[in-house]
From Swiss-Prot:
Signal peptide start and end residues: none
GO molecular function, one term: structural constituent of ribosome
Protein name as catalogued: Small ribosomal subunit protein eS17
Gene: rps17e
GO terms (BP aspect): translation
Family per record: Belongs to the eukaryotic ribosomal protein eS17 family.
Matches recorded under PANTHER family: 40S RIBOSOMAL PROTEIN S17
CC annotations in GO: cytosol; ribonucleoprotein complex; ribosome
NCBIfam families documented for this protein: PRK01151.1
UniProtKB keywords: Ribonucleoprotein, Ribosomal protein
InterPro entries: Ribosomal_eS17, Ribosomal_eS17_CS, Ribosomal_eS17_sf
Amino acid sequence: MGNIYTKDIKRIVKEIYDRYKDEIKDDYNTNKQIVIRYVDVKSKKVRNRIAGYLTRYYKIMKEKETSPAEEKEEISEEI
């Protein structure tokens, strides 16, 4: 079973993603440095959870961006 993140962590990740979309990568360590730079979190555990969910959220959003384009290509190939 996977981790379940609180609403606060999800909200913070969405705000970070919206503001700094160009800096975020699919690498956990890079995202951890972004969290350290832009979010004032004193707890190491919470900071790591934010960085981990940010990495996962980035991958999900990246898939959503590429999915509609792939579907259009498949439809045009079938016709």
